Structure formats: C-alpha cells, structure tokens
Amino acid sequence: MTTKRKPYVRPMTSTWWKKLPFYRFYMLREGTAVPAVWFSIELIFGLFALKHGAESWMGFVGFLQNPVVVILNLITLAAALLHTKTWFELTPKAANIIVKDEKMGPEPIIKGLWVVTAVVTVVILYVALFW
C-alpha cells in the first residue's frame, strides 16, 4: 500500500550560510581554495617560463610586477595565512598528547606550529636571498 501524502521538504534559501557567523567564517575558510588555485597556476606558469629561457623568465617577472597581480598575490597570501591559522587551531583537537598523565592544552601545539612555520620561512628566505 502506498501513501499519497507528500513528504515535508523544508525550504532552503541560497543565502542560508549568511545567517550565522560560524557558517560565514566556514564559507570564507573554504573560499581560500580559490586563491590557492590562482597561486598554483601562477607557479606552474613561472616554472614553464623558467624552463624556456631568460627571455621568457623576464616576461614572467614583468607579469608579476603588474599591480593587479601584486594585489591578487597579497590576497592569496592573506588567504593562505587564514587557512594556516585555522588548520593550526584544528591540529590540537586531532592529536591527544599526554605529558605526565595530563593532556596537553592546545596553546603549546599551536605556538610550536607557528614557530616551525617562521623558522622554515626564514631558512627559505635566507637560502633564496643569500646562498
């Protein structure tokens, strides 16, 4: 026997995520993938320019000096930092580190990750600029 009753379908607007700050921040965090795609394409373009010689590389450097590209790269940097911050805050929730029979709080783990990030950044900059 089948029923003729229609199931209730709750209406969902396309702006459902704008109602709560948690959802807005979630959408912002997920949106950091778009600048990551831009940077990936730019990096691949740069590698091909490097492969094709000095003239092609100089064209790529000129492309990077375009003010629009500089602004896009600054937006990409901000998005990468936001993404990094959120992942560093999630890491302690996924790792149970026990020291002297007590669970370690999230602060030392988050600070440690930022220290590692800063050290690696300084090493890469030193190698790139002075090696």
Swiss-Prot record:
Two distinct, membrane-bound, FAD-containing enzymes are responsible for the catalysis of fumarate and succinate interconversion; fumarate reductase is used in anaerobic growth, and succinate dehydrogenase is used in aerobic growth. Anchors the catalytic components of the fumarate reductase complex to the cell inner membrane, binds quinones. Part of an enzyme complex containing four subunits: a flavoprotein (FrdA), an iron-sulfur protein (FrdB), and two hydrophobic anchor proteins (FrdC and FrdD). The chain crosses the membrane at residues 30-50, 57-77, 109-129. SUPFAM superfamilies: Fumarate reductase respiratory complex transmembrane subunits. One of its GO terms (cellular component) is fumarate reductase complex. It is found in: Cell inner membrane. This is Fumarate reductase subunit C. One of its GO terms (molecular function) is succinate dehydrogenase activity. Belongs to the FrdC family. It is a multi-pass membrane protein. NCBIfam families: PRK04987.1. Keywords: Cell inner membrane, Cell membrane, Membrane, Transmembrane, Transmembrane helix. It comes from the Bacteria.
